[in-house]
Amino acid sequence: MKLRPTLLSAAIIILGLPALAQTPRYADSNINFEKYFSPATEAEVAPDAQGFIGRWLLLDPISKPNRSNTVFVDSYIREAFQREYYKGMAASMNTLDKNFPKDGQKIKAVVDGQKPVDLTAGRPRFYEEPEIIPQKVTLKWHAIDSKFFNVKLFRFATGQDLTRYGVIFWAVTVINCEEDIENVRLAVGSNSASMWWLNNEEAVILSGDRRMVMDDCASERLTLKKGKNILKGAVINGPGMSDFCVRFIDEAGKPVTNITITTK
């Protein structure tokens, strides 16, 4: 008897046919960190040909339990990003002094811990509300170059076997300019919600449950000042694949490429 694929499952139950052997598959297993990132060097780098910024200092993901992204309205993410998980966290990313994050720097923090996400179905079980458990952790800063135009935060986490669902990622970098560059816009795409600041001034906010789309939101006109400019951002996600892409564009929508990028 030949069974149609659509009837196969029913036939197994009704006729008592042997179940087909299946190997569990997980989207985040056997991830090669080096496929997505390389260590940042001391030398300045330029953005890619399309202006995307690939060099960043990334902080290990901070546990922020959420089983749904529908809560990511402006007020929610503003409050989430204002929280300091260690003393002087915000100030350290605002000024290029001795407290500015450094590659390999380890920070002791207190986070909203959560039990490991149940992945027996190959993806998070959204209906399970996380139990929040205050937890002392050590977070580390990493100076990386992304091998793609978008920074794949999910792979950054899985490549280190760190929490990848219900998290906040912080990123900061330094934009170097030989002269003032006026009337540019910061164009961002992120999965899921995010906020971005240039020289400690809010530039753009992306709220809601969203997928990463190139140039999804753009800031008002900005000026990149001669010298060093600090660009930082925070991305929050519940379930799903976290990533972002960032570049500056001019008034014609063309990428700004006459800049260099460092982590200090």
Residue ranges and their predicted role:
Residues Y165-N176:
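Short beta-strands within extracellular/lumenal beta-sheet-rich domains
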Residues E182-W197, L231:
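Aromatic-lined ligand-binding clefts that engage carbohydrates, nucleic acids, or primary amines
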Residues Q22-V151, A234-K264:
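Accessory carbohydrate-binding/adhesion or oligomerization-edge regions at the termini
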Residues S9-P18:
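Bacterial N-terminal signal peptides
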Residues M1-L8:
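Bacterial N-terminal signal peptides that target proteins for export
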Residues R155-G159, W170-V172, D215-S219:
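Short structured motifs
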Residues C177, L186-S190, V235-N237:
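Non-cytosolic beta-sheet module surface loops
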Residues L198-V246:
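Beta-strand-rich ligand-recognition modules
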